[in-house]
Every structure is written in C-alpha cells, then in structure tokens.
C-alpha cells in the first residue's frame, strides 16, 4: 500500500509537470501567433508605404512638368515659337523686347563642351588608374580627395573660377574678358571629374577578373589588357558616365552665374562674357519681373528648354547603358 501511494505521488507530480509544460507551450504559441500577426501586418504595410513614396516622386515630377508647361504655353502666346528658338538677340527689357534663346543655348553648350573636354580625359584616366593600377594605399588617399571635390559647394567653385582661374588665363590669353565662358567651363570640368571617375571606376570594376586573367594568360601586357579588354567591356557604363556628366554641366548654375557674366552675346568666342540658361533663370528670378509679364513667362520657357535638355541627356545615358551592356 505504501508503495502504491508513493507511485501515485510520483505520477501526480509527473502529470502536474506535464500540465505546466502544456501551459508554457500554449503561451509560446500565443506569443508566436501575436508576433506573426504583427510581422504579417508589417509585411503588408511596407509595400504600400513604398508605393506611396514612389507615387509622391511621380506626382512631384508631374507637378514640376505641369507648372513649366502651363507657364511656357502662356509665353508662346506672346512670343512665337520660331522667334524663340531661332532668334539670336535676347533683350528682355524695354519696349522692343526680343526673346531669342540662341545666346543662352550657345553659352550653355560651350561651357558644357569645355567642361567635358576637361572632365572626360582626366576622369577616365583616374578611373582606369584606380581600378587597374592603384594599390590599396594609394586608393585610400585618392578616394577621399575625389569625395572632397564632389562635396565642395558650387558657389566656392564659382569664386575659384573668378578670382583664381580667370587671372591666370588673362595673363596667358590676350583679350580675355574679366568674365568669360572659358574659365567657368574649365572649373565645371574640375567639378565633374569625381562623377565621371566614380561611375567609370564602377563600370571597370564590374568586369570579371576572369577576362583579365584570360588575356594575361594569352600573353597580353597589362596595358593591352586594360585598353583592349577591360575598357571595351565596360564601355556602356563609361559612356553613360560621360552623358550624365554633360547633363550635370548643362544644369550647373552658380559657377557660370558668378564667373561667366550676364552678357547675352550670341558668339562662339570663348574669351567673351556669355550667359547660360541657368544664369538667366537666376537673373530673372532675382530681378523685378512682374508676374504675368513676358519677361516673367520667359523664365519658364527657358526652364522648360533646360528641362528637356537634361531629360534627353538622361534618356541617352539609359539607352547607351542598355544598348551596350555586357552580360557576364
């Protein structure tokens, strides 16, 4: 009988322990269900949140485009489309105002061309060196320098062009005006070097090492591997970096506003003062153009032209990147 009660006591303890385990398991299941429900809610909410953010971006772009279009249409009610895009005289003030955009287009394209003549060779050579030749120690030094160049405010570049580069160029080039298109073009090129170098280096770094090793195994030199294997394989990304650099140069504002002057000359003489589209926008917005006037609407017409230019450049970059992309 005593043994029976002992066994019964042990059995009861075992049953109690089992019941406690069941309760713990139930609590864990309930907690898991609760956490699972929270995670499922989060999983459902995140895509919706991302969709809202994407819609905000699209709506913002659409709002900018609608604003530009509406005011540009109002401008072309007063100034003919042909006069605007073929006129070589821009005199927005006075009774006989003329609104030819060619002086601004010339200044913009010349400054951008000068900038890319500086940025493309230096940026590409820098990218090739960092990707193919530089040691880790050298890369750790050059990378921060490029990042510093990319982070300098453009107004600082503008004063650098006006107070440092222009005096040097005037001592070399006779007849160079105090404000000209050459000096800001050169400084814009210096500003764009980090963009071209960084994007081109990324494109070169994406080329598999197997292609380099295969060329070296066939007896090619390091120089031949770089320029006949690696660079052609990365050409889509390199060209895209050039096009994006041009787009950046076209949209630059402060450098040309400070260093190129405000003369609306239709000329191809790099020694003369010229005005770009962005500088004209700054001039008009900083002036006393009354709302509803032709001068006021010309601001939006020029801005719309600038928008189309940069959009075309970005589309070209995307097309080139897709057209010549290599699959590895």
Report each predicted region and the residues it spans.
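Transmembrane alpha-helices
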Residues: 199-200, 204, 222-260
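Cytoplasmic-entry segments and transmembrane alpha-helices of multi-pass inner-membrane transporters
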Residues: 47, 122-161, 199, 327
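Transmembrane alpha-helical segments of polytopic membrane transport and secretion proteins
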Residues: 2-54, 317-328
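Generic hydrophobic transmembrane alpha-helix motif, especially the helices
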Residues: 147-192
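Interhelical loop and adjacent transmembrane-helix boundary motif
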Residues: 256-307
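C-terminal transmembrane helix and the adjacent membrane-cytosol boundary/short C-terminal tail
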Residues: 201-205, 209, 216, 286, ...
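Periplasmic/extracellular loop-to-transmembrane helix junction in inner-membrane transport proteins
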Residues: 31-48, 69-115, 135-136, 283-296
């Amino acid at each position: 009988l005593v043994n029976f009660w002992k066994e019964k006591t042990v059995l009861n303890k075992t049953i109690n322990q089992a019941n406690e385990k069941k309760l713990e398991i139930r609590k864990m299941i309930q907690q898991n269900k609760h956490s699972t429900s929270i995670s499922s809610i989060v999983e459902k909410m995140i895509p919706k949140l991302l969709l809202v953010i994407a819609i905000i971006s699209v709506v913002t772009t659409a709002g900018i485009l609608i604003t530009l279009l509406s005011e540009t249409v109002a401008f072309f009610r007063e100034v003919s489309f042909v006069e605007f895009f073929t006129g070589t005289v821009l005199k927005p003030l006075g009774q006989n105002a003329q609104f030819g955009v060619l002086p601004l287009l010339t200044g913009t394209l010349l400054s951008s061309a000068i900038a890319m003549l500086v940025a493309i060779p230096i940026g590409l050579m820098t990218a090739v060196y960092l990707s193919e030749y530089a040691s880790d120690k050298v890369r750790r030094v050059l990378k921060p320098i490029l990042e510093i160049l990319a982070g300098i405010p453009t107004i600082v570049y503008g004063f650098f062009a006006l107070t440092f580069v222009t005096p040097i160029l005037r001592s070399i080039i006779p007849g160079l005006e105090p404000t000209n298109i050459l000096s800001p073009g050169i400084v814009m090129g210096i500003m764009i070097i980090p963009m071209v170098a960084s994007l081109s280096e990324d494109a070169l770094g994406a080329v598999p090492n197997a292609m380099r090793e295969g060329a070296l195994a066939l007896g090619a030199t390091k120089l031949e591997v770089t320029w006949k294997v690696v660079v052609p394989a990365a050409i889509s990304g390199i060209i895209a970096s050039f096009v994006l650099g041009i787009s950046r140069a076209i949209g630059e504002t402060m450098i040309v506003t400070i260093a190129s002057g405000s003369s609306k000359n239709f000329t191809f003489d790099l020694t003369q003062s010229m005005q770009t589209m962005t500088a004209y926008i700054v001039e008009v917005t900083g002036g006393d153009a009354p709302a509803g006037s032709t001068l006021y609407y010309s601001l939006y017409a020029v801005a719309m032209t600038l928008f189309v230019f940069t959009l075309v450049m970005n589309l070209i970059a995307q097309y080139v990147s897709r057209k010549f992309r290599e699959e590895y």
